[in-house]
């Protein structure tokens, strides 16, 4: 399936980070108002839910029907590992002041729920302990939430899927047939929100959904379990709900705890500035220095999943994957040139062509040919200002300059010589995210940038 998905970004005004939450579509509507809407990350300290939701966009292919997924509702809270930077987002659906920082976010979520095509909504949570209908101990009792399928009532007035209890019970049985450990058994939890006048649950997202005559289910995984196990149980439940809705799918990994762990922890890709630069993050170094940043373009980027963000902080930028820090970038500000976006060079004696922002695997060596009015800088290979026309082996590389701790991945950068003024041919990428709150550049920084060669783009080479 496509690695970088087409994503609609809904902008919310968030204190400090101002991160947007994203919404992706997977599959094609059959015009039967049978789309399933799935939310993750409504609380930022629940990684099982937001990782499961993210995988539905990056690693699933819906072959019949359609899902809409918003995996990172409280994205700023996810990055900060906070339940909610502006209070509990899941308690703002009954009423919210227009002055609340989450107001626009809540309105956008409601708009998604009220889409005519949406007939079922699934909200993913991680909760402490294990819900049990009867008291066993402090972590296994009726007041706990973990490993439960939660409904607000047994039945609703809806044209599709009115029997919430029956559907949720089927899901519980389905999950329990694939437990990693019998102690993880799921149970149905009916909060009887309206019947009992539960003042907290009356404010929640799922109650807003059923109040608008649509089926809603919350799936809880236990915070006492590792993240991959939580996501595993979420996906087991989601797949059963999708089957209930007649939605068919395939996925790129085996649905086991190990398969989910591998999918969550696979190599990340971040593409910067109209996809000119690829950062392939496979156990990356904690700091990457002298990363070209443009003074004449917007600071945009794309990622291989919707939980990864590039965030400005002082004089640097850092990359975060959900709750987890990846690396910090220290920029070198330059003018960028739009003259071309691919190069042809030799890899292990064979000619290959690669686009900027891509990675090429190398067994033995590579050689970048001389290019008129262009110089080449191979980061970690120190043989002069222009390093084209030289056969490069892994043994020639200084491993401390690799992107990864294993010393295998290196940047190869291309520059238009100052004063050449090559014809500009490329167009800007309009489907990218923006790095917010980058500091304004001083006159000296701009002057320095305009005295240097212009950055064209870069590729990565990965030695075996």
Regions found by a protein language model. Name each.
Residues 2-3, 17-464:
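Structured catalytic-domain cores with a bias toward divalent-metal coordination
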Residues 3-13:
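Sec-dependent N-terminal signal peptides
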């Amino acid at each position: 399936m496509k690695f970088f998905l087409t994503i609609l970004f809904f902008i919310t005004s968030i204190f400090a980070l101002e991160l947007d939450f994203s919404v992706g579509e997977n599959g094609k509507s059959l015009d039967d108002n049978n789309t399933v809407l799935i939310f993750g990350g409504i609380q930022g300290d629940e990684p099982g839910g937001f990782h499961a939701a993210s995988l539905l966009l990056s690693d699933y292919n819906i072959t019949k029907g359609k899902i809409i997924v918003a995996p990172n509702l409280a994205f700023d809270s996810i990055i900060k590992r906070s339940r909610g930077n502006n209070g509990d987002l899941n308690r703002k659906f009954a009423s919210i002041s227009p002055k609340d920082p989450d107001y626009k976010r809540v309105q956008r979520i409601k708009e998604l729920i009220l889409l005519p095509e949406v007939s079922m909504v699934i909200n993913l949570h991680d909760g402490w302990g294990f819900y049990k209908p009867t008291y066993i101990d402090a972590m296994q009792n009726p007041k706990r939430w973990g490993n439960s399928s939660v409904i607000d009532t047994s039945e609703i007035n809806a044209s599709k899927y009115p029997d919430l209890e029956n559907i949720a019970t089927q899901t519980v049985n389905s999950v329990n047939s694939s437990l990693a450990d019998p102690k993880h058994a799921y149970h149905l939890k009916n909060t009887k929100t309206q019947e009992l006048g539960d003042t907290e649950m009356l404010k929640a997202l799922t109650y807003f959904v059923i109040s608008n005559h649509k089926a809603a289910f919350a799936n809880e995984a236990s915070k006492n379990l590792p993240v991959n196990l939580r996501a595993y149980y979420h996906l087991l439940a989601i797949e059963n709900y999708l089957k209930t809705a007649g939605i068919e799918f395939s996925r790129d990994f085996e649905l086991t705890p190990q398969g989910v762990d591998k999918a969550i922890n696979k190599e990340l890709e971040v593409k910067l500035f109209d996809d000119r630069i690829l950062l392939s993050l496979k156990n990356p170094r904690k700091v990457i220095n002298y990363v070209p940043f443009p003074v004449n373009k917007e600071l945009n980027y794309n990622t291989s999943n919707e939980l990864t963000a590039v965030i400005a902080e002082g004089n640097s930028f850092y990359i975060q994957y959900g709750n987890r820090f990846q690396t910090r970038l220290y920029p070198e500000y330059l003018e960028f040139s739009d003259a071309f976006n691919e190069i042809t060079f030799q890899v292990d004696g064979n000619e290959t062509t690669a686009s900027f922002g891509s990675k090429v695997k190398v067994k033995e060596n590579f050689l970048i040919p001389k290019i008129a009015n262009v110089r080449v800088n191979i980061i970690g290979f120190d043989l002069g200002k222009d390093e084209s026309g030289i056969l490069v082996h892994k043994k020639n590389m200084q491993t401390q300059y690799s992107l990864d701790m294993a010393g295998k991945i290196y940047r190869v950068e291309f520059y238009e010589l100052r004063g050449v003024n090559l014809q500009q041919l490329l167009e800007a990428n309009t489907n990218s995210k923006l790095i917010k709150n980058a500091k304004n550049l001083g006159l000296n920084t701009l002057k320095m940038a305009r005295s240097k060669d212009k950055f064209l783009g870069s590729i990565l080479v990965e030695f075996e």
